[in-house]
């Protein structure tokens, strides 16, 4: 399994478990490896929204849509 996949899996698991700060850390590390992935930007946005950081979440959703305008999950 690649480092990127491990980071994403850890992020998703922590997000589902309510460990939002840890999830955010994993998604941010994954974005360092693949900054052009709209799904990662969306996951980061979901995590930030869960933390109540709505403005930052909105920016992540916008970035996701810039990368893939067809991504309805970000809209």
Model segments located where?
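Conserved structural position within tetratricopeptide repeats
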Residues: 29-32, 62-66
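Start-of-helix register in tetratricopeptide repeats
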Residues: 5, 39, 73-74
